[in-house]
Curated annotation (Swiss-Prot):
Compositional bias segments (type: Acidic residues): 154-163
Gene designation per UniProt: chsC
Reaction equation(s) it catalyzes: [(1->4)-N-acetyl-beta-D-glucosaminyl](n) + UDP-N-acetyl-alpha-D-glucosamine = [(1->4)-N-acetyl-beta-D-glucosaminyl](n+1) + UDP + H(+)
Entry function: Polymerizes chitin, a structural polymer of the cell wall and septum, by transferring the sugar moiety of UDP-GlcNAc to the non-reducing end of the growing chitin polymer. Involved in hyphal growth.
The name this protein goes by in its record: Chitin synthase C
Length: 920
């Protein structure tokens, strides 16, 4: 149950740790998710083991219907003639999630393309002619244009002159001519095989003409369905179109919204380095020279209108995106996602804040780029990843990354290793580090405080939870799951079913509790995996696997981020604690179940402390400041300071509530920054109070006759303050040293301590005051530019526009490169006039409310000698004086009311007298 199962085996052969761990291992495969030492339920897979498509033993492309249609001559694909003569039914899930028959036959595939002048590693040879040996290379996912399965589906080809003002989906060079081809739609699906620009092609090894391979063409699919129907609608991916379909051991997804090219490239560079590392492990039984064939990188962008143009240009530079071929509709169906596939051999590098093309990469990388038509949030992106693409590829391990998170050079391998070592590992995560830019960002106290918080979580929280086998949250920014552990049972219930409920929990019919809970849906997924019926999956923390990410450096951004985190984690924790009994439906041992119950009890105590955090902090503040008012400490000075700070404390607390209930953090930044500075002052005063009270208590003990060191521990003040706080801080330091990671104690400890009141008061108040806000902090969908449609013609064909000319392809490629060739313009946050005016009105309202509340509070405090004013007068007459002031106040108020009533009565009588004489 250790937090790091890699230990010293890292660097050895991947399976040399224990031959007994995988008794069924064959064909150089990794441990199957269904191959633990003891069997577990296999029948809970919703798709079920079904009849597989027959594959020949050779590397020839199987005689199978495919949804690909020909884009150019030589393209791979079938036509109607084949389907008419080869009737075949298709099960609901061709590549079933069946752990007992998991990819045994598809692990070692030769990679032997033609040697070119660009080559510096062995690539073998292609046949000289296209029809020779009938595509013996497994990398060629295509059929011949005129093959035994049917004739070329093209019937006509003609050219039209494109007008200069022709509509294109995004800025592109104006083409002089565009070739229009009639393309056959199969089952209503449009799939195009698009040649890449010669400028790009000449940089990488590829098949010599007329040969074609995964390096010469990019594959585009216009998905017109929901992710859950992707397979049933007969869409597929390149990896399944080879003669011997490639097995996907690692399926890596990078989700993004509108991240810029720098953040995206930073993540992609880290992923590429990990793939290079796995290809360099030549002694491994799973990885090695051709390891890249077992790894697929999927980039999913949330909304065509939202993607950053510079980021899209980087994808085009890699060859995985081309402008101008996407369609809005196919045969009257709206396109829901544009799917681009290409195996890139282009590397990226960062120079300062600029992305540059490095040239040829060390190893190829199989990439899928899914550009969703609409902005439907991150959870929908994960639906495309798991339900659509995952169902087709049937991977072993899925790795989740956010754009901007940079994995370490071998971090993904180390995550995979955790699954390899522990067959029952259902999920794992690494250490999330704050990106500090060589320490420069530590000058920002907010960044330093978050750095300490992250470190403390990775040193104490996650290792402890990993020891029990249940980590409350595997961060979506960098985590991994075993695909089979996520699958639903035969009734459609399970981890993925519960996880994707969150997509439906943002409408009018969603309960507010459930909607808030699904702001942290990754916590729900973790709980469902560990408590999965008749299974015994565990979650693990892998400290040796790291990922770096940026954190908010502005208070407004920080508050908005933590609002979602705090609300989601709180309600998800309530859900987990309330459903702790579901642990009994799992197949864990009795000892493990007991350990998990202990962890749930620990989380309950943590949740209670979070619930009472504001009250606990105020009580500690009040008790310490009251101590300072004693005669043997600060005396009158302590009393005055205590009352002043208490009034300011309560005033700031009320201000937090008023702002949280109606103001946007970005529009009230001055208010919030003022409060942060005040809370820092409060923490400094509290630290001074702790030290001063402790020193005075020690001096008092020392001055007594017969003093011994043990007498200090009999002093309640010393024992309460020093022993409790000291043990906490010393424990942090010792744990950091044990984990060989102590530097944050020297660089970030003070900043974290000073920001503690801000964490407790500002963040918690804003979060709980905005439980009605169940958004992810992103704006609504912008209107995307309309794309051309592919309309059905007689004969089941559509017209598609194709840039045929090499000059056009090169010009388009140069245009994309130019988009990120220059340094990005400095991002300036533009606030609209409507937002500015709304912020002004809300700020004025908040100021009026605060002035009204504070004046009434001050009146009550003065009359009743409350809120600390009674500390100034310690005489015995204090009670009598207070009663006298109350009596006088009551008399003033009541007689004032009576006087006002008399005044109004006299005025009313005078009105009647005047009216009587006027007669009106």
């Amino acid at each position: 149950m250790s937090y790091n199962r890699l230990g010293e085996s890292y660097g050895e052969d991947d399976h040399s740790h224990s031959p007994m761990m995988n008794p069924h291992q064959t064909n150089n495969r990794s441990p199957s998710p269904g191959r633990p030492l003891n069997a577990y339920q296999l029948s809970d897979v919703s798709y079920g083991p079904q009849e597989r498509l027959h594959m020949p033993s050779s590397d020839l492309l199987a005689e199978q219907p495919t949804y690909s249609v020909e884009r150019l001559p030589n393209s791979y694909g079938h036509n109607e003639a084949y389907e008419q003569h080869h009737q075949q039914s298709y099960p609901g899930y061709e590549y079933a999630v069946d752990p007992e028959a998991h990819h045994d036959a598809y692990y070692t595939q030769p990679y032997q393309p033609t040697v070119t002048p660009h080559d510096d590693y062995d690539l073998g040879q292609y046949p000289e002619h296209q029809h020779q040996h009938s595509y013996s290379d497994d990398r060629i996912p295509m059929l011949q244009q005129d093959n035994p399965f049917g004739p070329d589906p093209y019937s006509d080809e003609y050219q039209v002159e494109e007008q200069a003002d022709g509509h294109t989906p995004s800025p592109a060079p104006i083409r002089r001519w565009k070739t229009v081809k009639e393309v056959q739609l199969f089952n209503g699906n449009l799939v195009l095989d698009c040649p890449i620009a010669p400028k790009l092609l000449n940089q990488v090894p590829h098949a010599e003409p007329p040969g074609r391979d995964e390096f010469t063409h990019m594959r585009y699919s216009a998905a017109t369905c929901d992710p859950n129907d992707f397979f049933e609608e007969r869409f597929t991916l390149r990896q399944k179109l080879f003669a011997k379909p490639r097995h996907t051991e690692l399926f890596i997804v990078v989700t993004m919204y509108n991240e810029d090219d720098f953040l995206f490239a930073r993540t992609l560079i880290g992923v590429f380095k990990n793939i290079e590392h796995m290809c360099s492990r030549t002694h491994s039984k799973t990885w090695g020279k051709d390891a890249w064939k077992k790894i697929v990188v999927c980039v999913i962008s949330d909304g065509r209108a939202k993607i950053n143009p510079r980021t899209r240009a980087v994808l085009a530079a890699l060859g995985v995106y081309q402008d101008g071929i996407a369609k809005q509709q196919v045969n009257g169906k709206d396109v829901t996602a544009h799917i681009y596939e290409y195996t890139t051999q282009i590397a990226l590098e960062l120079k300062g804040t600029q992305v540059q093309i490095k040239g040829r990469s060390a190893v190829p990388v199989q990439m899928i780029f899914c550009l969703k038509e609409k902005n439907q949030k991150k959870i929908n992106s994960h639906r495309w990843f798991f339900q659509a693409f995952g169902r087709v590829l049937d991977p072993n391990i899925c790795v989740l990354l956010d754009a901007g998170t940079k994995p370490g050079k071998d971090s993904i391998y180390r995550l995979w290793k955790a699954f390899d070592v522990e067959p029952m590992c259902g999920g794992a995560c690494g250490e999330i580090k704050v990106m500090l830019s060589h320490g420069k960002k530590l000058l920002n106290p907010l960044v330093a405080g978050q750095n300490f918080e992250y470190k403390l979580s990775n040193i104490l929280d996650k290792p402890m939870e990993s020891a029990f086998g249940f980590i409350s949250v595997l961060p979506g920014a960098f985590s991994a799951y075993r695909f089979v552990a996520l699958q639903n049972d035969k009734n459609g219930q399970g981890p993925l079913e519960r996880y994707f409920l969150g997509e439906k929990m943002h409408g009018a019919n969603a309960g507010i509790f459930t909607a808030n809970m699904y702001l942290a849906e990754d916590r729900i997924l973790c709980f469902e995996i560990v408590t999965k019926r008749n299974c015994r999956w565990l979650l693990q923390y892998v400290k040796s696997s790291t990922g770096e990410t940026d954190v908010p450096d502005q208070m407004a951004e920080f508050i908005l981020q933590r609002r979602r985190w705090l609300n989601g984690s709180f309600f998800a924790a309530v859900y987990a604690i309330a459903h702790f009994y579901q642990i009994w439906r799992s197949d864990h041992s009795a000892i493990r179940k007991f350990a998990l119950l202990i962890e749930f009890f620990y989380q309950t105590i943590n949740m209670l402390f979070a619930w009472f955090g504001i009250g606990n902090f105020f009580l500690v503040f009040h008790i310490l400041t009251t101590y300072l008012g004693q005669k043997d400490l600060l005396g009158t000075t302590g009393k005055v300071l205590g009352v002043v700070f208490e009034w300011l404390y309560l005033a700031t607390l009320v201000t937090c509530f008023v702002l949280a209930l109606g103001n946007r953090p970005g529009g009230s930044n001055k208010f919030y920054m003022t409060m942060v500075y005040f809370w820092i002052g409060i923490m400094i005063y509290l630290a001074f109070a702790c030290i001063f009270v402790t020193v005075k208590s020690i001096q008092t003990e020392v001055q007594q006759d017969g003093f011994t060191f043990t007498d200090l521990f009999t002093n309640s003040t010393f024992f309460t303050i020093i022993v409790s706080l000291g043990s906490t801080y010393v424990m942090w330091f010792v744990a950091s040293i044990i984990f060989l990671d102590p530097w944050h104690m020297f660089t970030s400890f003070i900043q974290y301590i000073l920001l503690t009141p801000t964490y407790i008061n500002v963040l918690n108040i804003y979060a709980f005051c905005n439980t009605h806000d169940i958004t992810w902090g992103t704006k609504g969908d912008d209107k995307a530019e309309k794309l051309p449609s592919a309309n059905l013609k007689p004969g089941g064909k559509v017209d598609v526009d194709i840039p045929q000319d090499d000059g056009d392809l090169n010009a388009q490629y140069d245009t994309e490169l130019a988009k990120f060739a220059e340094k990005p313009p400095k991002e300036v946050q533009v606030i609209s006039e409507e937002e500015r005016q709304a912020d002004y009105y809300k700020g004025f309202r908040s100021a009026v409310v605060l002035a009204w509340v504070f004046c009434n509070f001050a009146l009550g405090a003065v009359v009743l000698s409350a809120a600390g004013l009674d500390r100034f007068d310690q005489s015995e007459k204090t009670s009598e004086d207070s009663n006298k002031r109350s009596t006088i106040y009551m008399a003033v108020v009541l007689w004032s009311v009576a006087g006002l009533s008399i005044f109004k009565f006299i005025g009313a009588l005078w009105y009647l007298v005047v009216r009587m004489f006027r007669g009106v």
